[in-house]
Amino acid sequence: MANKTSIRSKKAAAKRVAAKAAKPRKTEPKSWSRKVAKPALLAGGNPQIAKADGDAPVQAYIAAMPGWKRDIGRRLDTLIVRTVPGVRKAVKWNSPFYGIDGQGWLLSFTRYVKVAFFRGTSLRPLPPAASKHKDVRYLDIHEDDALDEAQLAAWVKQASQLPGERM
């Protein structure tokens, strides 16, 4: 008798599964219909991207930069990669970082686009903006500023040959 009961329950279960599979869905499963949320913008207008190493998080950061900043971010990234082959990338503290493996970080950009040279006082000519940190110098790029790519590339090349900042 127990055998007949288990056979009946197996048949009933098989019918339920077949009936469910045959019914068309009214909506897509939630995992398919979810839209990828855009990163939140922080108070300074920068995208909030999770801390991670590699090119992908830096590209996500650049893609999420608002308006004119996105174009500057792409240009900076291209210039840095062209100037320092094999450059290491990461996002830390909601900012993209660029460095040399085993030597630390050499620069970052944030805000309006603020390029931070961590050993900037060793660069010639000095990047224009001073910092409260004795070795750091900045290049601030605003929406209508012309970007001197030759000078920026020279600073990036010089910075890549100096000891980096360990973070």
Describe each model-derived feature in a short phrase:
Residues 2-167:
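Charge-dense, helix-prone N-terminal extensions
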